[in-house]
C-alpha cells in the first residue's frame, strides 16, 4: 500500500489590502503650519480640562458629609457642593481625595455647585489604622498648628499618647502646642509639673488650662489668633469645653466623664472647620484612644521623637535606633538623667509597634 503523502506546509502570506490608497504626501505641504493633530491626553491635561460654561471660584472645605456632599466657604458665602464626575473616579479608590481644610475650585454655575479641582496641599495631619494593611486617614489639611489636648484627671493624663501626637505632627511638619486641661482637679501642682515639664524643657509650648476657671485661656487665645489650628486629643479631655470658653457662640455639645472608669464620651463625631471671630480657623476632630503611625516611618522616629531631634545628630551611627548602639547620645543622656526613664520607655514602645 502506498504511504500517504505528507501535507506540504506553505509559508503564510498576508492578505492583500483592498480598496486602499496612500495619502498624497503633497497634501501635507499644503496644510497650515498651526494645525493641531489630536493626540492622547496625559492625566495632567485631563485634570486641567474644564467645560466652557464653568464659572470657577476658589473656596475651602469646612465639612465633609455623606454621599459626596461638602460644605464649602467661598466669597464669604457657604455652599453645599458635590464632587465632579472626574474626581469621583479618584474618590472611589481613595478616601483621602478630599479633606477638611482643602482649598478647591468650585463651579457655581452647576446645580448643585460642583468641586472641579483640588488645589495642592501645604500639609496634612494623617493617622493610620493599626492593622497590617494600613490605610491613611487625613484628619485635616493646610493647617498651621496642632493643639494636643490632654487632661490631668478624668481621664487621667497619658504622656505616651502625647508622644504619639507630637510624632504625628512632626512627620507632617506641623507645629505642636500642648495644653493640660482640667488643672482645677489637680491637688499637687508639683507632681503635675514633674510629669510634663520634659516637653517644655525640649522646646514645646506648654499651657495649663481650665475651662471651668478660665486659667490659661487668655494665653491660648493669643496662640490661636489668625492661625488655623486643629484640636486633637483623647476623648473627654475637654476640647469642646475649651472651644466654648474661647468662642461661646459656638455652643458645642459636651458630656460628663464617667466617674467609674474616668473615660470620656465622643461629643465630636466628625472633623469640621470653623472660623474664629478673632481670625483664623478651628478644626475640631473626634477624640481617639490611641494614635497609629505609618509603619514605613519607623526609620524617622529616632530623629523626631520629642527631645531626640538635637541628640540624634550627635550619635556615632547615622541610623542609630537609640536602643543598643555604642556611642549613642540618647542613651548617654538617659544615663545622665537628662531624659526621664518613662519617656524613653514610651519611645521604645512606639518603635516596637511599627
List PLM regions with ranges.
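Helix-rich effector regions associated with P-loop NTPase G domains
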Residues: 1-28, 35-37, 55, 68, ...
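SH3/SH3-like beta-barrel fold
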Residues: 70-74, 81, 106, 115
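Beta-strand/loop nucleic-acid-binding surfaces
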Residues: 78-96
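Switch/coupling subdomain of P-loop NTPase systems
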Residues: 99-100, 114, 134, 141-143, ...
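Conserved Switch II/interswitch segment of TRAFAC-class P-loop GTPases
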Residues: 109-111, 116-126, 143-161, 184-188
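Conserved beta-strand/loop subsegment of P-loop NTPase cores
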Residues: 143-150, 172-183, 203-209
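Canonical P-loop GTPase G-domain recognition
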Residues: 185-237
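A conserved segment at the C-terminal end of the G1
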Residues: 239-255
Amino acid at each position: 500500500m502506498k504511504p500517504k503523502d505528507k501535507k506540504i506546509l506553505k509559508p503564510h502570506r498576508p492578505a492583500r489590502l483592498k480598496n486602499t490608497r496612500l495619502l498624497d504626501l503633497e497634501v501635507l505641504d499644503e496644510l497650515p503650519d498651526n494645525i493641531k493633530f489630536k493626540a492622547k491626553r496625559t492625566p495632567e491635561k485631563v485634570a486641567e480640562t474644564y467645560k466652557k460654561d464653568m464659572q470657577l471660584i476658589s473656596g475651602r472645605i469646612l465639612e465633609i458629609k455623606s454621599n459626596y456632599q461638602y460644605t464649602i466657604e467661598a466669597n464669604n458665602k457657604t455652599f453645599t457642593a458635590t464632587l465632579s464626575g472626574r474626581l469621583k473616579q479618584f474618590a472611589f479608590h481613595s478616601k483621602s481625595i478630599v479633606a477638611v481644610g482643602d482649598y478647591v475650585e468650585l463651579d457655581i454655575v452647576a446645580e448643585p455647585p460642583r468641586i472641579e479641582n483640588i488645589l495642592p496641599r501645604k500639609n496634612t495631619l494623617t493617622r493610620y489604622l493599626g492593622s497590617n494593611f494600613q490605610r491613611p486617614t487625613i484628619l485635616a489639611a493646610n493647617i498651621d498648628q496642632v493643639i494636643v489636648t490632654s487632661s490631668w484627671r478624668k481621664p487621667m493624663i497619658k504622656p505616651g499618647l502625647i508622644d504619639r501626637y507630637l510624632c504625628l505632627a512632626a512627620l507632617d511638619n506641623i507645629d505642636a502646642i500642648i495644653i493640660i486641661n482640667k488643672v482645677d482637679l489637680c491637688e499637687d501642682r508639683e507632681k503635675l509639673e514633674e510629669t510634663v515639664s520634659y516637653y517644655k524643657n525640649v522646646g514645646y509650648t506648654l499651657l495649663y488650662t481650665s475651662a471651668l476657671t478660665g486659667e490659661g485661656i487668655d494665653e491660648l487665645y493669643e496662640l490661636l489668633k489668625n492661625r488655623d489650628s486643629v484640636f486633637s486629643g483623647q476623648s473627654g479631655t475637654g476640647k469642646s469645653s475649651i472651644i466654648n470658653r474661647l468662642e461661646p457662640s459656638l455652643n458645642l455639645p459636651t458630656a460628663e466623664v464617667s466617674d467609674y472608669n474616668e473615660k470620656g464620651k465622643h461629643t465630636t463625631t466628625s472633623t469640621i472647620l470653623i472660623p474664629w471671630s478673632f481670625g483664623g480657623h478651628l478644626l475640631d476632630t473626634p477624640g481617639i484612644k490611641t494614635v497609629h503611625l505609618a509603619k514605613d516611618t519607623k526609620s524617622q522616629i529616632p530623629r523626631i521623637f520629642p527631645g531626640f531631634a538635637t541628640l540624634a545628630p550627635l550619635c556615632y551611627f547615622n541610623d542609630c535606633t537609640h536602643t543598643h548602639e555604642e556611642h549613642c547620645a540618647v542613651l548617654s543622656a538617659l544615663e545622665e538623667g537628662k531624659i526621664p526613664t518613662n519617656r524613653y520607655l514610651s519611645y521604645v514602645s512606639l518603635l516596637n509597634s511599627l
